[in-house]
Regions:
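Extended carbohydrate-recognition surfaces in non-catalytic/accessory domains of CAZymes
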Residues: 20-111, 166, 171-174, 605, ...
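Accessory beta-strand-rich segments of carbohydrate-active enzymes
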Residues: 33, 38-40, 83, 88-191, ...
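Short flexible loop/turn segments that cap and initiate beta-strands
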Residues: 52, 221-226, 239, 270-276, ...
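Extended substrate-binding grooves/exosites of carbohydrate-active enzymes
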Residues: 60-66, 70-73, 177, 287-690, ...
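Extended acidic/polar, glycine-enriched regions
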Residues: 147, 212-304, 698, 704-705, ...
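Beta-strand-rich structural segments
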Residues: 209-213, 279-281, 665-669, 711, ...
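Short S/T/G/P-enriched beta-strand
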Residues: 303, 644-664, 670-672, 725-751, ...
Length: 841
């Protein structure tokens, strides 16, 4: 119950992390509702920015919004299957709003958590800003242009027409939250509070608080700055106060430093995510002009070369996954409920780490990792100067990388969940080439301002421009945060890698290359090591290719086109890419090498785009241990059996085949010494896991209709059984809602699992029936359907879905009205089913 309370508390703080308070203090208003939208590459922006422009014909919607996921799949889109085979384009968002005259003395800002990409913002007829990077927050001041008590119009142009620009599905639009901020003339700048633990023992902690203020009053002001630290129960732990004289802000802001003491600190850890809250108050002449809240967890992290990762002095493995930002059938549009569903499934699997691949995440993800107990690798870029796709961020890197990297670190550095920064993923600057890009003159002056000795090192081959660029990025991070190590995801394991030669890269990070891992202590003496990206096994939920001890390495090479008539990958953990491994192989490497701090498995969930090893009609990935709809694949239970203490007894595959088939039966289990298989009551033998094998297997089990059962024993006593029955023909539909109560907020969701059953109530594992959905009662909408198939061309935003290996999914959202929602599912002659949801205020 404590964990749930923590989670709810931190979600409330997501609105006030930037600040709290109303009236005389800061006001932060959610600005997501009541927008109009048009997808039009030919719109005249000079006309659209005018207040008199007629937008009545535009679509009415609320943010966050991803227009691409609403479209049809097509191989003709320039994004290609790698980008999800969904449309790009130019989208326009427009909103009318009023600001009261009582706010005339305040500073007014508009804050975007993220929009993909090339976002231009216009306010009351004037362009006020442009931001190219699609994953970074940005903010503009509106004050001088506001019509107080009159009509105000904001217009946002999001241009994702230059495709391809991403190796995976990016989404399109204002896909993260937007806020309107009102504060005093002297105020804390956005992300302007930095807390760091300067000393920590069992009995005491010392915190340094740096508060960055700006003064936009136009005159010198004497201000009272107060920092108040409170515990979870609201008790004051310590406070500090100062009265600086703040000059009007021109080019620089003013930093105020306070020291706070915490007696007997309650430490943040993965099982007890205790958070303090720092309250910052700014007063002038006794009047509150700004207030600001910052949640903070006190903890100690350490990485060592011989033992890996320590949290609060406890050695532990980082059992992590890589996670892209899309939410399946919801696309890239952030939703707290959908994101929490993903993280809860991973937590239940035993996962304790998230790598944000390969970009700054939504702030909601970090808030949830703080409260749910994950450690995080926060990553800035997928490319630097050398591009990976025709129109990616490389074209903006020279001008924008420093701004974007600083904004990421400033925003995220107070999160206890973050234990390392990553400055890049598989950047091409790891290697030299005769055709290597040269730095711009401005960048050369910035990065290559070296003395005689460094120049000699370059000439002798010890350093080069890419090495110095790496050091430049590291310095940007460490100038803003000295409490966490810096790493990068590298797919070149050689010490000659330009990034590894750089000074200041604290942790060696390999993407894959298991065979090179034993040499890490020799090649990088004294350096901690982590597998920043691992495995890349391939699987289609419900599909099995035998014999299971055969290995399918697909494709033969990443740049060679590959085809297989099934467009499916075996779920036996016997299919992986040539640069990757099986799940069990990497589990074994991490488990049996103390110096390996852990791994980030590629990936936790399937994601839209990058459908390796296939091309069209495949349009989403095969890498996840959970499919795109949120249904676990078999490998999920392998990790749960190794990473968690939850009892696991998972037998697969199903038991509905052609008579006479010979089937390989696998079992993942824990908390048992042995497992025994029975077919129609007859034993097929006892099996045990071995030192380097993490499953039990019975090869070529002769199939006969009936049932297959596994019995687990510990010390001779039965501790678990699992039985699978042969399924008959489809007869009915079963609906299972993940919750039957929603909050009437127009955001809450219910995920409903749809299963096709036979007459006895057994899942039909090969069923492909088309299921239709209707809201038969209540004010709600279907906001997504899916079935986990990476090759389905069915749209996500319709009211029907074909079952895939017996299952599909429908997601229901309320429209803000309290009452009862009823969803009914039907399919031809199958017995229909309904589920009811109560919507409460």
């Amino acid at each position: 119950m404590k964990r749930i309370v923590n989670f709810i508390w931190i979600l409330l703080c997501t609105v006030v992390v930037h600040a709290s308070g109303s009236g005389d203090g800061r006001q932060v208003e959610n600005f997501d509702f009541g927008w109009r939208f048009s997808l039009d590459p030919h719109l005249n922006e000079r006309k659209a920015m005018k207040q008199s422009f007629d937008d009545e014909g535009w679509k009415y919607l609320n943010l966050p919004h991803d227009w691409a996921v609403e479209g049809y799949f097509s191989e003709k889109y320039p994004s290609g299957p790698g980008g999800g085979a969904l449309p790009g384009g130019v989208g326009w968002y427009r909103k009318h709003f009023k600001i009261d005259k009582k706010d005339a003395g305040k500073r007014i800002y508009i804050h975007f958590d993220g929009a993909y990409m090339n976002t231009s913002v216009y306010f009351n007829g004037k362009k006020i800003g442009w931001r190219p990077y699609g994953y970074i927050p940005f903010e503009y001041e509106l004050t001088s242009l506001v019509n107080f008590d009159g009509d105000n119009v904001i217009l946002v142009k999001v241009d994702n027409s230059d495709q391809p620009n991403s190796r995976w599905y990016s989404g399109c639009g204002i896909y993260r939250n937007v806020y309107l901020i009102k504060t005093g003339g002297v105020h804390v700048v956005t992300d302007g509070t930095y807390i760091k633990t300067t000393s920590l023992t069992d009995k005491a902690a010392e915190l340094e608080v740096v508060t960055t203020l700006c003064n936009k009053t136009g005159k010198q002001e004497t201000v009272e700055v107060k920092s108040i630290l409170k515990d979870r129960d609201g008790n004051v732990v310590d406070e500090a106060e100062s009265r600086p004289i703040i000059a009007p802000t021109t080019d620089s802001n003013t930093d105020i430093v306070h020291t706070l003491d915490v007696a007997n600190p309650h430490l943040w850890n993965l099982d007890d995510t205790y958070m303090y809250t720092l309250f910052t108050e700014i007063k002038i002449d006794g009047f509150l002009v700004d207030s600001y809240e910052t949640p903070y967890g006190i903890r100690n992290i350490k990485f060592t070369a011989d033992k890996g990762f320590f949290l609060n002095g406890k050695n532990m493995k980082i059992n992590g996954v890589c996670l892209h930002h899309d939410l399946g059938c919801l696309g890239a549009a952030i939703n707290n409920v959908a994101l929490h569903r993903q993280l809860k499934m991973l937590k239940d699997m035993g996962c304790n780490g998230i790598r944000c691949t390969h970009n700054p995440p939504a702030p909601e993800l970090l808030n949830m990792c703080d409260t749910m107990g994950f450690v995080v690798m926060d990553e800035a870029f997928d490319m630097w100067r050398r591009r990976k796709t025709a129109n990616d961020y490389a074209r903006f890197f020279d001008k924008w990388h420093e701004v974007d990297l600083k904004d990421m670190v400033r925003r995220d550095r107070n999160h206890p969940c973050i234990v390392m920064w990553s400055i890049g993923n598989e950047v091409l600057e790891q290697w030299n080439s005769a055709n290597a890009d040269t730095l711009s003159l401005a960048m050369a002056n910035l990065v290559l301002n070296f003395g005689h000795n460094e120049k000699q090192e370059i000439e002798s081959g010890k350093k080069n421009m890419n090495t110095l660029l790496t050091e430049h990025l590291i310095k940007i991070v460490k100038d803003l945060d000295q409490t966490r190590p810096v790493t990068a995801g590298c797919n070149e394991p050689s010490p000659a890698n330009n990034l590894f030669k750089a000074e200041g890269l604290d942790i060696i990070g390999y993407n894959y290359h298991n065979k090179n891992i034993p040499d890490v202590p020799k090649n990088f003496p004294g350096k901690p090591f982590i597998i920043t990206e691992s495995v890349s096994a391939l699987a289609t939920r419900g599909y099995y290719r035998m014999p299971s001890d055969s290995m399918f390495i697909w494709p033969k090479r990443w740049d060679i086109p590959f085809e297989d008539a099934t467009f499916s990958c075996s779920s036996y953990d016997n299919c992986h890419v040539p640069w990757g491994s099986t799940h069990e192989e990497t589990l074994d490497v991490v488990k049996n090498n103390d110096f390996v701090a852990g791994q980030f498995l590629w990936t936790g969930f399937d994601y839209i785009g990058e459908p390796t090893p296939f091309g069209w009609p495949a349009r989403s990935s095969f890498f996840g241990v959970v499919d795109l709809a949120g249904f676990p694949k078999d490998a999920y239970y392998l990790y749960q059996s190794e990473w968690s203490d939850k009892p696991v007894l998972h037998l697969f595959p199903h038991w509905t085949w052609d008579e006479g088939d010979e089937i390989d039966m696998w079992c993942y289990y824990n908390n048992a010494d042995e497992v025994e298989l029975f077919v129609n009551g007859e034993s097929r033998g006892v099996r045990k896991k071995t030192e380097h094998c993490y499953h039990a297997v019975w090869n070529k089990v002769f199939y006969r209709p009936g049932s297959v059962k596994v019995v687990a024993r510990k010390n001779g006593a039965i501790v678990g059984t699992k039985e699978i029955f042969t399924a008959g023909k489809p007869r009915s539909i079963r609906l299972t809602a993940d919750k039957t109560v929603q909050k009437a907020d127009r955001r809450d969701l219910t995920y409903i699992t749809v299963e096709i059953l036979d007459q006895q109530g057994h899942l039909c594992p090969d069923a492909t029936d088309l299921v239709r959905f209707v809201i038969s009662q209540g004010n709600a909408k279907i906001i997504g359907v899916d079935n986990g198939s990476p090759i389905s061309s069915e749209r996500f935003k319709i009211d029907c879905r074909r079952a895939f290996y017996g299952k599909c999914l429908v997601v229901v959202q309320n429209n803000g009205d309290a009452g009862k929602i009823k969803l009914t599912a039907s399919s031809g002659v199958l017995t229909p089913a309904s589920v009811e949801i109560d919507v409460i205020r």
